[in-house]
Amino acid sequence: MMAAMATARVRMGPRCAQALWRMPWLPVFLSLAAAAAAAAAEQQVPLVLWSSDRDLWAPAADTHEGHITSDLQLSTYLDPALELGPRNVLLFLQDKLSIEDFTAYGGVFGNKQDSAFSNLENALDLAPSSLVLPAVDWYAVSTLTTYLQEKLGASPLHVDLATLRELKLNASLPALLLIRLPYTASSGLMAPREVLTGNDEVIGQVLSTLKSEDVPYTAALTAVRPSRVARDVAVVAGGLGRQLLQKQPVSPVIHPPVSYNDTAPRILFWAQNFSVAYKDQWEDLTPLTFGVQELNLTGSFWNDSFARLSLTYERLFGTTVTFKFILANRLYPVSARHWFTMERLEVHSNGSVAYFNASQVTGPSIYSFHCEYVSSLSKKGSLLVARTQPSPWQMMLQDFQIQAFNVMGEQFSYASDCASFFSPGIWMGLLTSLFMLFIFTYGLHMILSLKTMDRFDDHKGPTISLTQIV
């Protein structure tokens, strides 16, 4: 089944290949093509659907090689299964997955015993109806849970294997079960094959439980974001291959974001640098905040319309200081979408509270918010405005990112950036384009103004003599 997803290779003769590589523009063209292909691959994830009912999808509906399925097209595939199929829907949500994972680790070329997707392949073979979409737009997947909730009229229930065995599912009542696969492809302690095999075992155990209870169902497997099977290689215009004995660059250590959890991850917060000043005395809170297991999140709170992330630090400036990020989620009728806003940032210390307005930290609730600088300093944009001036407190967050609504796992959704449209780089590009357009127009005008001479003197011919008439 997965072998059909592998692409065929085209072989070139040695003479043709040597002739092509003599062309100076070919490496540059291949570099740009590879970069464009890599950028496009990061925007899509696969989606696998199967059901215990028959005739939910047409036999040729899954022939989508090279096509990216949009959210509208995905709804046309899901509507028949949700309206005519079973009312019990399972959504297996993995951290990272790409179509290349099936090619690299699936049971292709008859090697079924080496497949990391044995339970998934068996489920697809035995399912009366199945559908495989190799490339689905990330936006469609990010809104899949909300779409299923609206179509079924049931809230998503986060379950694990133990909880599923205790549930009593009814074929007539709708149920949306969200199963987060416990292994993530970002784990450095496990190989990708072991990660995918562990996820496949969870899928097999869940399906066995439903089969033993004789419960009809429709299942879907997808991921939050794509993964990369091959190791990233820097593509430059000068050449595509690695240099011999090249030393691999050491990647910087990136700490995981701060995550507030109740029954699931609710609020995510990250910054490359988190610094605070009190009476012009600066303290770097980055090593005390990110990657710290004992971070005090007492006072944090979350629901669908309001979120509060509370960070408490002891012995900061000689006392206990608490920073509270207050966010609200509202539905705006004009856009018919939910937007979140960080209403304020509170600093609690010694019984006093300092307030910073942060109304410019806003975006659609399905996205996270990212900004290069969120600071109270004027030279850094002043997105944080103190209510009382002058304030003894100063804040500076570099490469700031936060998400408090529609969080799925320990990873941020795609970010809504604070960068304005008319940035200095865009102004430079516009002015340069206008200047080049002026030069082109002037040159075209000069070319069109050229005139040919219909008469001229022939210096090699006889001279013209004029007789003087008296």
Swiss-Prot record:
The keyword Ribonucleoprotein does not apply. The modification Phosphoserine is found at residue 465. GO terms for biological process: cellular response to increased oxygen levels; endosomal lumen acidification; endosome to plasma membrane protein transport; Golgi lumen acidification; intracellular iron ion homeostasis; intracellular pH reduction; lysosomal lumen acidification; osteoclast development. InterPro entries: Ac45_acc_su (IPR008388), VAS1/VOA1_TM (IPR046756), VAS1_LD (IPR046755). Keywords: Congenital disorder of glycosylation, Cytoplasmic vesicle, Disease variant, Disulfide bond, Endoplasmic reticulum, Glycoprotein, Hydrogen ion transport, Ion transport, Membrane, Phosphoprotein, Signal, Synapse, Transmembrane, Transmembrane helix, Transport. GO terms for molecular function: ATPase activator activity; small GTPase binding; transporter activator activity. PANTHER family: V-TYPE PROTON ATPASE SUBUNIT S1 (PTHR12471:SF2), VACUOLAR ATP SYNTHASE SUBUNIT S1 (PTHR12471). This is V-type proton ATPase subunit S1. The gene is ATP6AP1.
